[in-house]
Amino acid sequence: MRQQPHYLELLSPARDAAIAREAILHGADAVYIGGPGFGARHNASNSLRDIADLVPFAHRYGARIFVTLNTILHDDELEPAQRLITDLYNTGVDALIVQDMGILELDIPPIELHASTQCDIRIVEKAKFLADVGFSQIVLARELNLSQIAAIHQATDATIEFFIHGALCVAYSGQCYISHAQTGRSANRGDCSQACRLPYTLKDDQGRVVSYEKHLLSMKDNDQTANLGALIDAGVRSFKIEGRYKDMSYVKNITAHYRQMLDAIIEQRGDLARASVGRTEHFFVPSTEKTFHRGSTDYFVNARKGDIGAFDSPKFIGLPVGEVLNVAKDYLDVEATEPLANGDGLNVLIKREVVGFRANTVEKTGHNRYRVWPNDMPADLHKVRPHHPLNRNLDHNWQQALTKTSSERRVAVDIMLGGWQEQLILTLTSEDGVCITHTLDGVFEEANNSEKALNNLKAGLAKLGQTPYYARDMQVTLPAALFVPNSLLNQFRREAIDMLDAARLAHYQRGRRKPVAQPAPVYPQTHLSFLANVYNHKAREFYHRYGVQLIDAAYEAHQEKGEVPVMITKHCLRFAFNLCPKQAKGNIKSWKATPMQLVHGDEVLTLKFDCRPCEMHVIGKIKNHILKMPQPGSVVASVSPEALMITLPKRRGV
């Protein structure tokens, strides 16, 4: 079910159900969360019970719950995945986010399907194909620019989802195999070893060092705050925040930030609306600078930029807050541009490495000057010279505000009380149009003080503090001001609210899986390499059904034993170091994008440059010991070494 074209959906991540609830309270229109398995985040799974409890909470606000089932599946996992999908459907979740096309060939309920960013959706033809085979919502590649997004939007009937904030994978999503090649941990199965965050030395084709021991594959974090309006104009309707590993404070803060940004656009334009209901009030000032980030970039949305990498450090440095004046044995003196507090996280950069510490005690010693005693004094801190820059990556006082109730979300209710002396009639209508009527029989006398009685009735009916509602409009149409005991009025109101709650949940409609377009679509390629990530026979059947003739096995099947692209990325190190032929002045033909090397310890990777699409291919080879390991997801691979030993036949004489 494609969303209404004027609805804007803020989609937040959740590591667990508690974070999901807070994301919704802070303004999310939808939340994506991992289920018990197959969720592309190895350590971010949740039980069916937790998800089942979360669903009605979300639906009270018209918010949707998407469950990630976006790993590629081994044949041995197809049956368990099919059972899990049925169980998830029965909990009431709104949609599945999937990568493996084999899922579309399984016998599953008619649950709405969303195409994961792992599907590597960069071109119109692929986006249209996915929309035509049954995907209601598609997550586009982060590397696309505004015109590419607009072209896909115009060509498909699927809701366009796009990442607007959070960590950036340097590779096209779904096109990174370096983790599996080096460690046996597959990124396409949610177990990335993050080789992109390691330090590398870059060498040219003559072996000369271009850059030494820098984090050359580590990207800054995505931040599309300034581009929200342009993304809306391009057709984006679901605005996705990355971060299913992020903590509660991060999700609260970033969700609140984008809620306020989108609400301002909605109010300004008038022809747009949020995709869920409720009024959100935040009790803190959101700041994208105060929770984890590696610096900010809008990546390729507008144009290629040179400054997209976090080469110095993949860690969170924070904001500048002053400089170090002196370092003693167990304290340091600093001059600060902002007040410091006990518990602050502070750091300095020494030879491109972050040296951090927690402030145990902070004492003001003069105007903008402080003496700071760390919990543990880092030895490297004594290398710092006077006036060395000081950063803060944990603002203790600001973080404390996020540990408390930091937001409130309530749904508007219009209240009408009518009737007569023998019966009260209470009508509640929620902002999403659900209406209930509740009656209270009795003998209610006219009050001696009609003004006071009327005010008491209104005040009693408006007491909605422990509910997710607030009174937007109040009308009393009784023929006279009647006296109603507070105990009766409170019970009457509570019963009506319970009725409204039940009616709204019953009225909620979740989407269904789209039917396949007729005539049946044809996949835009007839030959699929390992880059298509086909890992099971059901995925093969799917692609054969739609016209693909030759299908290579996924990289995790261990059939690619030679050197292949283990990472394909829009990030180009030639461009970053002004070595791109397109940057050359004069005779461009004299410049060649010759291969380069990335070196980390004993690991040597070759860089090849495809200048027509402006891509860099990282070439590597799977390690021999990984080739001998069981295929990820197979029954053998899922058995512990101890359990596997039990299954082996015993040798004679042992």
Regions found by a protein language model. Give the residues of each.
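Surface-exposed amphipathic alpha-helical tracts and adjacent flexible/coil segments at the periphery
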Residues: M1-H26, A30-I33, G37-A40, L54-V55, ...
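Aromatic- and glycine-enriched glycan-recognition loops and surfaces
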Residues: N43-A52
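Short active-site loop/helix that positions an aromatic residue
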Residues: G102-P109
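Short, glycine/polar-rich helix-capping loops at beta-to-alpha or helix-loop-helix junctions
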Residues: R122-K126
